Amino acid sequence: MIISASTDYRAAAKAKLPPFLFHYIDGGSYDERTLKRNTDDLGDVALRQRVLRDMTDLSLETEIFGEKLAMPIALAPVGLTGMYARRGEVQAAKAAEKKGIPFTMSTVSVCPIEEVAPAIERPMWFQLYVLKDRGFMKNVLERAKAAGVTTLVFTVDMPVPGARYRDMHSGMSGPNAAMRRVFQAMRHPSWALDVGLLGKPHDLGNISTYRGEPTKLEDYIGWLGANFDPSISWKDLEWIRDFWDGPMVIKGILDEEDAKDAVRFGADGIVVSNHGGRQLDGVLSTAKALPSIADAVKGDLKIFVDSGIRTGLDVVRMLALGADCTLLGRSFVYALAAQGGAGVENLLDLYDKEMRVAMTLTGAKTIADLSRDSLVKIP
């Protein structure tokens, strides 16, 4: 398969992966309306073309929390990344480091913190869920500190799991799921060898280290379901703010009032996110939610955004709408599944090229030059 654009990796991943894994990363909740709107609404944002400007010194570099980024992108936390390529978290982290951007590790990664952190020199970021098991939360935060993690990304939009109907049909869950996954793996021998056999252990590494015993993937849904905490409030986050020395980012903000609460709480950043359309279907796309949030809190903290970003042009659109930096989730996992770490590197090269074209033709020589003036209209 020819990869000529960043969006080509989705088809490549679909061809290589067993359906239960492809649809797990590709799908959304309920009728997947928000999932679709994320990409559609962002694609409708019209860039303002400007010409006859000297763009010879164009730069994509930016700085977040004192950390230099080669471009305003970080790899987002994605659960089970290690099921998409052999020791996938390690491969993705190395690719991000090589391209000069941060890698964010998920709480529910296959590889544990202690495996990924030593594989790279650049400090990684770490994502944590709000869980009933506060002992686990404290344990994993202590381990993240010891591993040199700089930035904590705290996910707050999963007090309960979203209803992802596609998973029931694909074999990720539902009747006879384990048997269905085995049959699917047999029909995808490349994945079965590279990940199914050579990528073991298939553990939830961070959880297994805490529990002192292997955590099979079959335990994934059950453990998370039992530990989501719908009682969580801003007050419950205070001990984490006190415990964590570095920057703390609140992920899952879609409303300007919640963004203002994050400022009052003392967060260093927020992620404008609807969890990639995987939680509450029917909410705003991030492209629609971002402008009013940026109007409310821009300059008070760093604004990240995810959900629906598939190209370098999309990154430029999000920055023009008010974001300081973007997070890539599905996009990098598609590339990882298709071509491993080399695929992620190539994907980021494609994003780089796409951003440079968009910025050249909008007259933005630096990331700071991107603003609402770079758009024809705000959707």
Curated annotation (Swiss-Prot):
Cofactor: FMN
Keywords, ordered alphabetically: Cell inner membrane, Cell membrane, Flavoprotein, FMN, Membrane, Oxidoreductase
Positions bound to substrate: Y24, Y129, R164, R278
Protein name: L-lactate dehydrogenase
Active site: H275
Known function: Catalyzes the conversion of L-lactate to pyruvate. Is coupled to the respiratory chain.
InterPro entries attached to this UniProt entry: Aldolase_TIM, Alpha-hydoxy_acid_DH_FMN, FMN-dep_DH, FMN_HAD, FMN_hydac_DH_AS, LldD
Membrane topology, from the record: Peripheral membrane protein
Entry GO CC: plasma membrane
Molecular function as annotated in GO: FMN binding; L-lactate dehydrogenase activity
GO biological process terms held by the UniProt record: aerobic respiration; lactate metabolic process
FMN hydroxy acid dehydrogenase domain boundaries: 1-379
Organism superkingdom: Bacteria
Pfam family, one: FMN_dh
Residues bound to FMN: 106, 127, 155, 251, 306-330
Alphabetical list of SUPFAM superfamilies matching this protein: FMN-linked oxidoreductases
Subcellular location: Cell inner membrane
Catalytic activity: (S)-lactate + A = pyruvate + AH2
Family designation: Belongs to the FMN-dependent alpha-hydroxy acid dehydrogenase family.
Keyword Membrane: yes
EC assignment: 1.1.-.-
